[in-house]
Amino acid sequence: MKRKVDEFMERHGLGVGDLVRVVKREGDERITFEGLVMPPYELSPGETLTIKLDNGYNIGILIDAIEGIEILEKAKEAPKMEFREVLPRKEGLPSVTILGTGGTIASRIDYKTGAVHAAFTAEELAKAVPEIFDIANITPKLLFNIMSEDMKPEYWKKIAHEAAKALNSDEDGVVIAHGTDTMGYTAAALSFMLRNLTKPVVLVGSQRSSDRPSSDAAMNLICATRMAVSDAAEVMVVMHGETSDTYCLAHRGTKVRKMHTSRRDTFRSINDVPIAKVWPDGKIEYLRDDYRKRGEGEVEVDDKFEEKVAILKIYPGVTSELLEFLVDRGYKGIVIEGTGLGHTPNDMIPAIERAVENGVAVCMTSQCLYGRVNLNVYSTGRRLLKAGVIPCEDMLPETAYVKLGWVLGHTDDLKEVRRMMLTNYAGEITPYTRFDTFLR
């Protein structure tokens, strides 16, 4: 059965991409709109005609409210984009590899469902933001095209190897286009897997898809490319520093977290200050002087990783059954998001003792995110320490999860696991708690 919008388009000879003038009846008023006809969403009821206005936004007009429609220009077939093996290069510019993994920075609207889907190749992304060619000679490479919720540890390994390959072949830096939802996990993973890092590795994404007027994709990519040729030889996340298009912040890969579902400045450095502010015009203001500096030497990949690691959140009413299930299923490590300073219910402690006795590494973080785990303050914490829990200082739960998987990839000796978890490898542990970083 045809929907109303399908019949309307057929009756008036409308095609997707046609430029039309629509007269809409609204009470006694008549309102005129001009725009491009968009494909009807497959899953919509089909009661509206969708057109894209010249400001880039889409509007839906009820079919029953349309008093007249005129085709101003029929859609023209879009020219096919030509792809070349070698993109234009300029003498004297540094070289940057862009690794494409998907995500919103490389996405378009799927008009069949109305959802956002990964779409651009790395080359399309580079061509969509020509400003980056004035910053560096760009070598794009598409590794995979997924949304970040589909990211897996095996993909982290591939990204790490491709990044190291580029850096060891005389590239000046690497930019990784990545979805924002799990970008913090990937940034942490690369921070541990890329050893002896001598050049910048920058993860970048966007909160608004590339075809939206409010997209932050272009500015984020420009700023990310600026940081990729900078002096900071760190794994960084570069995203908007505030909601307007002024500057981006470069966050250390082990201390950064997505803190808002939709704001463009969603990423925050937690328990730490960002490495730098970076403006699209190339200005960089370093906010700290202890960042790793660009240097010489070959980047090494240490991608050993134990995937049987889980995060367990503590909440009122939680029982030890969840923890026991993980132990019985052969998990090698458990990161607990404890309450406050790092606590669990007292009746869960026997299950934790059993887990440790069975060789399972149990680590404690705080679901507060800000602040530091301290198991020496209250009796519950002291019991957890006695049970063998490893307090993870001020590490983010996500970072602790990634680090524990990486550590267990190297050893299953719990004494060595404790030593490695409490060793600061990539800035994941700050030496003291800074009070000026709370909710900044």
From Swiss-Prot:
<dbReference type="InterPro" id="IPR037222">
    <property type="entry name" value="GatD_N_sf"/>
</dbReference>
<protein>
    <recommendedName>
        <fullName>Glutamyl-tRNA(Gln) amidotransferase subunit D</fullName>
        <ecNumber>6.3.5.-</ecNumber>
    </recommendedName>
</protein>
<comment type="function">
    <text>Allows the formation of correctly charged Gln-tRNA(Gln) through the transamidation of misacylated Glu-tRNA(Gln) in organisms which lack glutaminyl-tRNA synthetase. The reaction takes place in the presence of glutamine and ATP through an activated gamma-phospho-Glu-tRNA(Gln). The GatDE system is specific for glutamate and does not act on aspartate.</text>
</comment>
<dbReference type="GO" id="GO:0004067">
    <property type="term" value="F:asparaginase activity"/>
</dbReference>
<feature type="active site">
    <location>
        <position position="180"/>
    </location>
</feature>
<keyword id="KW-0067">ATP-binding</keyword>
<dbReference type="InterPro" id="IPR027474">
    <property type="entry name" value="L-asparaginase_N"/>
</dbReference>
<dbReference type="InterPro" id="IPR037152">
    <property type="entry name" value="L-asparaginase_N_sf"/>
</dbReference>
<dbReference type="InterPro" id="IPR011878">
    <property type="entry name" value="GatD"/>
</dbReference>
<keyword id="KW-0436">Ligase</keyword>
<dbReference type="InterPro" id="IPR040919">
    <property type="entry name" value="Asparaginase_C"/>
</dbReference>
<dbReference type="InterPro" id="IPR020827">
    <property type="entry name" value="Asparaginase/glutaminase_AS1"/>
</dbReference>
<dbReference type="GO" id="GO:0005524">
    <property type="term" value="F:ATP binding"/>
</dbReference>
<dbReference type="GO" id="GO:0050567">
    <property type="term" value="F:glutaminyl-tRNA synthase (glutamine-hydrolyzing) activity"/>
</dbReference>
<dbReference type="InterPro" id="IPR036152">
    <property type="entry name" value="Asp/glu_Ase-like_sf"/>
</dbReference>
<dbReference type="GO" id="GO:0006450">
    <property type="term" value="P:regulation of translational fidelity"/>
</dbReference>
<dbReference type="GO" id="GO:0006520">
    <property type="term" value="P:amino acid metabolic process"/>
</dbReference>
<feature type="domain" description="Asparaginase/glutaminase">
    <location>
        <begin position="94"/>
        <end position="424"/>
    </location>
</feature>
<feature type="active site">
    <location>
        <position position="104"/>
    </location>
</feature>
<dbReference type="Pfam" id="PF00710">
    <property type="entry name" value="Asparaginase"/>
</dbReference>
<comment type="similarity">
    <text>Belongs to the asparaginase 1 family. GatD subfamily.</text>
</comment>
<comment type="subunit">
    <text>Heterodimer of GatD and GatE.</text>
</comment>
<dbReference type="Pfam" id="PF18195">
    <property type="entry name" value="GatD_N"/>
</dbReference>
<dbReference type="Pfam" id="PF17763">
    <property type="entry name" value="Asparaginase_C"/>
</dbReference>
<dbReference type="InterPro" id="IPR006033">
    <property type="entry name" value="AsnA_fam"/>
</dbReference>
<feature type="active site">
    <location>
        <position position="181"/>
    </location>
</feature>
<keyword id="KW-0547">Nucleotide-binding</keyword>
<keyword id="KW-0648">Protein biosynthesis</keyword>
<dbReference type="InterPro" id="IPR027475">
    <property type="entry name" value="Asparaginase/glutaminase_AS2"/>
</dbReference>
<feature type="active site">
    <location>
        <position position="258"/>
    </location>
</feature>
<dbReference type="InterPro" id="IPR040918">
    <property type="entry name" value="GatD_N"/>
</dbReference>
<dbReference type="InterPro" id="IPR006034">
    <property type="entry name" value="Asparaginase/glutaminase-like"/>
</dbReference>
<dbReference type="InterPro" id="IPR027473">
    <property type="entry name" value="L-asparaginase_C"/>
</dbReference>
<dbReference type="GO" id="GO:0006412">
    <property type="term" value="P:translation"/>
</dbReference>
